[in-house]
Curated annotation (Swiss-Prot):
Residues that bear Phosphoserine: 13, 304
Subcellular location: Nucleus, Nucleolus; Cytoplasm
Key words, A-Z: Acetylation, Cytoplasm, Isopeptide bond, Methylation, Nucleus, Phosphoprotein, Ribonucleoprotein, Ribosomal protein, Ubl conjugation
Main localization category: nucleus
One protein family per Pfam: Ribosomal_L3
Single GO molecular function: RNA binding
Protein name (database record): Large ribosomal subunit protein uL3
GO CC terms, sorted: cytosolic large ribosomal subunit; nucleolus
Gene symbol of the encoding locus: RPL3
Organism in which the protein naturally occurs: Oryctolagus cuniculus (Rabbit)
Similarity comment: family membership: Belongs to the universal ribosomal protein uL3 family.
Length: 403
């Protein structure tokens, strides 16, 4: 900032340095919520996949506010959350230098989509992962060893986490390799946590057992990648005057002569996006149920409300752009979340005790928009579109060919 007439704050935060590509694709939970033994045993996190955005209409319940009892339109994000499968239990002991892994126990049967996570190239591999380990569950000596492991975990461990993976075959994605993560089990005693986890080995855990309606959660993920960007785009520094020699989307002064180095705090060109970020306080507007078969019929009606009784699913006409159809359970979050469509997101219970009125507000949805997100959508359902458009030429041609 040499020879400037007025002082000015620096551009861009130094709190997110180094701005480089994230080493991991899946958002990492760096701290779980504090354990409270008085609460029932529960999981503290879940994995989901970003499908896309839409908007909703709801009535605000905020007495004293100007918008109280008025309708508001708000943007929401749909995150598809198929049930996760528990495949292991990890026990931790507390040491003066933090937590240390004490024992890890895997389930007897582990699906191929989970085993793929342990291989670089599944196609060329012998696919032998866990073949020796699973025999522990079958012979007497192995069973005795497992019982011994569980009893020692009950005796020595302070923290219990479960290993759970997503079910990629239920999603409209090409990826076959499941995402695997450790999820901390909170509530109850250590013995109760272990019994809870042992009962759920190889079982599916739905998102409705982890989060509740109107809950505030945190979303952890990796942002959209933008590639190598110049200093103006990356740090939002001021453009130089038009007549500037050798370019104007630059930083004019990158430091003093001495020290004869460029300081780390000076804005420079480089990687933008694909950074690991944690966004706190995202409100759950709805936990929706996936498609289900009832009395031999496929029920898709998961976007109706008490005010909008039309039979429609959460999917917009033509599906979510660059994603497809959401057929499993989903979580509707207020506002936007990090990452591109199809990006895996880690949903975590809030670390804070929520006391604000906005956080505790009850959400009553009046309407969920399901118009096409590709262009200017006009119709909420296929039936509505057919009724408006009338018989189409392509329908007549198809009918003639069929006849």
């Amino acid at each position: 900032m040499s020879h400037r007439k007025f002082s000015a704050p620096r551009h861009g935060s130094l709190g997110f340095l180094p701005r480089k590509r994230s080493s991991r694709h899946r958002g990492k939970v760096k701290s779980f919520p504090k354990d409270d033994p008085s609460k029932p045993v529960h999981l503290t996190a879940f994995l989901g996949y970003k499908a896309g955005m839409t908007h909703i209409v709801r009535e605000v319940d905020r007495p004293g506010s100007k918008v109280n009892k008025k309708e508001v339109v708000e943007a929401v994000t749909i995150v598809e959350t198929p049930p996760m499968v528990v495949v292991g239990i990890v026990g931790y002991v507390e040491t003066p230098r933090g937590l240390r892994t004490f024992k890890t126990v895997f389930a007897e049967h582990i699906s191929d989509e989970c085993k793929r996570r342990f291989y670089k190239n599944w196609h060329k591999s012998k696919k032998k992962a866990f073949t020796k380990y699973c025999k522990k569950w079958q012979d007497d000596a192995g069973k005795r060893q497992l019982d011994k492991d569980f009893s020692s975990m009950k005796k020595y461990c302070q923290v219990i986490r479960v290993l759970a993976h997503t079910q990629m075959r239920l999603l409209p994605l090409r990826q076959k390799k499941a995402h695997l993560m450790e999820i901390q089990v909170n509530g109850g005693t250590v013995a109760e946590k272990l019994d809870w986890a042992r009962e759920r080995l190889e079982q599916q855990v739905p998102v409705s057992q982890v989060f509740g309606q109107d809950e505030m959660i945190d979303v952890i993920g990796v942002t959209k990648g933008k590639g190598y960007k110049g200093v103006t785009s990356r740090w939002h520094t001021k453009k130089l005057p038009r007549k500037t020699h050798r370019g104007l989307r630059k930083v004019a002064c990158i430091g003093a002569w001495h020290p004869a180095r460029v300081a780390f705090s000076v804005a420079r060109a480089g990687q933008k996006g694909y950074h690991h970020r944690t966004e706190i306080n995202k409100k759950i507007y709805k936990i929706g149920q996936g498609y289900l078969i009832k009395d031999g019929k496929l029920i898709k009606n998961n976007a109706s409300t008490d005010y909008d009784l039309s039979d429609k699913s959460i999917n917009p006409l033509g599906g979510f752009v660059h994603y497809g159809e959401v057929t499993n359970d989903f979580v509707m979050l207020k506002g936007c979340v990090v990452g591109t469509k199809k990006r895996v997101l880690t949903l975590r219970k809030s670390l804070l005790v929520q006391t604000k009125r906005r956080a505790l507000e009850k959400i009553d949805l009046k309407f969920i928009d399901t118009t096409s997100k590709f262009g200017h959508g006009r119709f909420q359902t296929v039936e509505e579109k057919k009724a408006f458009m009338g018989p189409l030429k392509k329908d007549r041609i198809a009918k003639e060919e069929g006849a």
